Regions:
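Structural motif
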Residues: 125-127
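N-terminal, post-signal-peptide region of Sec/Tat-exported proteins
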Residues: 45-83
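PDZ/PDZ-like peptide-tail recognition elements
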Residues: 60, 72-110
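Cleft-lining beta-strand/loop regions that shape enzyme active-site pockets
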Residues: 20-33, 37, 41-54, 77, ...
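Residue-level recognition of conserved beta-strand edge/terminus positions
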Residues: 131-132, 163, 334, 349, ...
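Conserved functional hotspot residues or short segments at active or partner-binding sites
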Residues: 345-346, 350-527
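Polar, glycine-rich mid-to-C-terminal structural blocks
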Residues: 292, 304, 311, 315-383
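Bacterial Sec-dependent N-terminal signal peptides
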Residues: 1-30
Length: 527
C-alpha cells in the first residue's frame, strides 16, 4: 500500500473550495492527524498477525469518517459508482429490451423502439435462452448476471438464442449493442379533455428534453392545464430541475439558492421563454419525493405558479459535490444546503452519525399519524414563510409541505394482496397470460380506449392466482378481504396487460383511475 495515498487524498479533498488562508491552516492541522491514520494502516499491513485486505480497510476507514457527518455524504467503489451514475446519464450500452423473468427464463416484455433488438426482429414475448453460447434459461442465473451478459460496449455483438411461441426451432440473432436510452418520463397522457399528466421518476441529463417533448405531445392533444407527478421521484441533477422549472416560470424568477461554509452562495433563476407559462399547474408529491423533486415543487409553490398536492416530501436538501478518486471510486461530499425562493431550508433535521434514525423517518411519520391525518401536523410560527406573489403561508422545517393534503390510504390494498404480489405470483401470472393471448388481445382491442372500457380480467386467471397463493399458504382472512383482494388483483392485472400491449402511459391510466391524489388535483384545477 502507498503510505502517502491517504495523506494526499485527504489533503486534496480538504483543499477543494477553501480560500488560501483556510487551506494552509487546515492542511497543517489535518496533515498531523492523517499521519496517525497512515502510520496505523502501515503498521497493520506490516505487522498484524493475520493477512489484511488493505483495500477494504481503507474503504472501511473512509466510510467510517463519512458516517460521522451527514446522512448523504457517502463513498462508493468503482462498480457502485458506475451503477449509481447510469440512471442519470440517460443511457447505457446494451441490446435494448425490457424483460422479466418467468420461471428462470428471460421473457421480452418490449424491445426498445428503434433499438438494436427491434431492428433485427426480436419481438415481445420472445424468450432469450442463451447469450454468446452461454445458456441463461433454466439455470437460476441472477438478474444481475444476465444483465452483465446482455450489456457490453457499443458496437460489440451479442449472439442470442431465441425461443418464439409456435416456432419449433431456436432462432438466432446477432444484435449489435448500442446506446440505449434510460427514460425519466414514465407516463404522459390526457386525464380530461383539458388536463394532462406527466409522471417522471428522476432528474437526469435527458429529463428536461423528455419533459419538453411530453408537454408538446399533450398540447397537441388539447392540454391546457398540467399535473406534474413527482410522487416517489428521488431527484437527481440540480441543473435538470432548474431547466424544467424555467419552462414554467417567468424570466428571472428565483428557483433555488444554496448556502455553504466553504463554497460561494449560488442562485438559480429561470431563463424564461418556457413552453408552458400560462396554464394551471398542480404538482403531486409524497414522502418519497426528494432532492431535485423538492426543488421543482418548492419553486412552483413559492412563486405561486401552481399548487402542490399530496403529503410532505422527504426533505433531502443537502448539496453533494462528487469527488472522483483515480481508481474510479467516488466520494459525494455535502458542501451546501438548498433553500426555496421563500427561504425555506429543504433539508429535514438530522443527528450527525445517526443514519439508522434518519432512515426510519418515514416510518416515524407514519407511526405519528402524519401520513394519514392532517391534524397531526403542527408548525411553530418560526417555520411559517410567505410565497413571493400572493403571500400565501407555506411551511419550512424540512421537505415541501403541500398546499392540499391527501392522506395515505392504508386500507386500499389488503394484506392478502400485498403477500401475493410480494411473492411475484401476479407478475408471473400476467407473463403467462400475455404470452398465450398477446395476438388475440391485439386483434380484439385495436385501441387502448376500447381496452380500457371493455376488457375484464378473466375469472380463470384470477383463479390461477389464488390457487398458486394457496400453495404458498396465502389466503384472505374472510369473504370481505377476498372481495377487496379480487378488486386489487383485477386492477393491477389490467394495468400490467395494458403496459405489455402498449406502454407505461396506459399502465398509469388504469392505475390512476380511482387515485385520490390525482382526483384531488383534477378537482382543484377544474375550479
Amino acid at each position: 500500500m502507498n503510505r502517502n495515498f491517504l495523506l494526499y487524498t485527504a489533503l486534496f479533498l480538504l483543499s477543494v473550495g477553501l480560500n488560501a488562508q483556510d487551506k494552509k491552516s487546515n492542511m497543517e492541522k489535518l496533515e498531523r492527524e492523517i499521519q496517525k491514520l497512515v502510520m496505523t494502516s502501515v503498521q497493520i499491513n506490516n505487522f498484524y498477525v493475520d493477512s489484511v485486505d488493505t483495500h477494504k480497510m481503507v474503504e472501511d476507514a473512509i466510510n467510517g469518517i463519512l458516517s460521522k457527518l451527514d446522512p448523504h455524504s457517502a463513498y462508493t467503489n468503482a462498480e457502485e459508482t458506475k451503477k449509481l451514475n447510469e440512471p442519470l446519464t440517460g443511457s447505457f450500452d446494451g441490446i435494448g429490451v425490457q424483460f422479466n423473468m418467468l420461471e428462470d427464463t428471460l421473457v421480452v416484455i418490449q424491445p426498445v423502439p428503434k433499438g438494436p433488438s427491434e431492428k433485427v426482429g426480436i419481438l415481445a414475448g420472445d424468450r432469450i435462452v442463451n447469450v454468446n453460447d452461454t445458456t441463461i434459461a433454466g439455470v437460476k442465473m441472477t438478474r444481475e448476471e444476465i444483465m452483465r451478459r446482455l450489456r457490453g460496449p457499443k458496437g460489440t455483438n451479442a449472439h442470442l438464442g431465441i425461443v418464439r411461441r409456435d416456432i419449433k426451432d431456436t432462432l438466432y440473432f446477432d444484435v449489435k449493442r448500442d446506446k440505449i436510452p434510460v427514460n425519466s418520463v414514465d407516463a404522459a397522457y390526457m386525464l380530461t379533455p383539458r388536463i394532462g399528466l406527466i409522471r417522471f421518476n428522476n432528474f437526469a441529463q435527458t429529463t428536461h428534453d423528455e419533459i419538453v417533448e411530453a408537454i408538446q405531445k399533450l398540447q397537441k392533444e388539447g392540454m391546457k392545464d398540467l399535473i406534474l407527478d413527482l410522487q416517489q421521484n428521488g431527484g437527481g441533477y440540480l441543473q435538470a430541475a432548474a431547466d424544467i422549472a424555467s419552462e414554467f416560470l417567468e424570466k428571472g424568477d428565483l428557483i433555488v439558492y444554496t448556502k455553504g461554509r466553504s463554497v460561494p452562495d449560488q442562485e438559480f433563476r429561470s431563463e424564461g421563454g418556457g413552453i408552458f407559462t400560462e396554464g394551471k399547474i398542480a404538482v403531486l408529491i409524497d414522502e418519497y419525493s426528494a432532492s431535485a423533486a423538492e426543488i421543482l415543487s418548492g419553486a412552483i409553490q413559492d412563486q405561486d405558479r401552481g399548487i402542490v398536492v399530496g403529503r410532505r416530501s422527504f426533505g433531502k436538501g443537502l448539496v453533494q459535490r462528487p469527488l472522483e478518486i483515480p481508481d474510479g471510486s467516488m466520494i459525494r461530499l455535502t458542501i451546501a444546503r438548498y433553500y426555496t425562493p421563500s427561504g425555506r431550508c429543504i433539508q429535514k433535521p438530522y443527528e450527525k452519525g445517526d443514519t439508522k434514525g434518519y432512515a426510519q423517518d418515514v416510518l416515524n411519520r407514519y407511526n405519528k399519524g402524519e401520513l394519514t391525518n392532517a391534524d397531526s401536523i403542527h408548525f411553530p410560527d418560526s417555520l411559517r414563510y410567505q410565497t413571493l406573489r400572493k403571500q400565501r403561508t407555506v411551511y419550512g422545517g424540512g421537505g415541501i409541505m403541500p398546499d392540499y393534503f391527501v392522506p395515505l390510504d392504508t386500507t386500499k390494498l389488503t394484506k392478502c394482496y400485498r403477500e401475493i404480489t410480494a411473492k411475484g405470483i401476479v407478475i408471473n401470472a400476467n407473463l403467462r397470460y400475455i404470452d398465450k393471448n398477446r395476438d388475440k388481445l391485439k386483434k380484439e382491442y385495436s385501441s387502448f380506449e376500447k381496452f380500457k372500457k371493455k376488457f375484464q380480467v378473466p375469472d380463470e386467471l384470477l383463479g390461477e392466482i389464488y390457487a398458486e397463493a394457496e400453495k404458498q399458504k396465502i389466503q384472505p382472512a374472510d369473504a370481505a378481504e377476498k372481495e377487496k383482494t379480487d378488486g386489487n388483483i383485477r386492477k393491477i392485472l389490467k394495468a400490467l396487460i395494458a403496459r405489455d400491449l402498449w406502454d407505461m402511459s396506459e399502465y398509469f391510466s388504469i392505475i390512476y383511475q380511482d387515485d385520490e391524489v390525482v382526483a384531488k388535483a383534477i378537482e382543484l384545477l377544474q375550479k
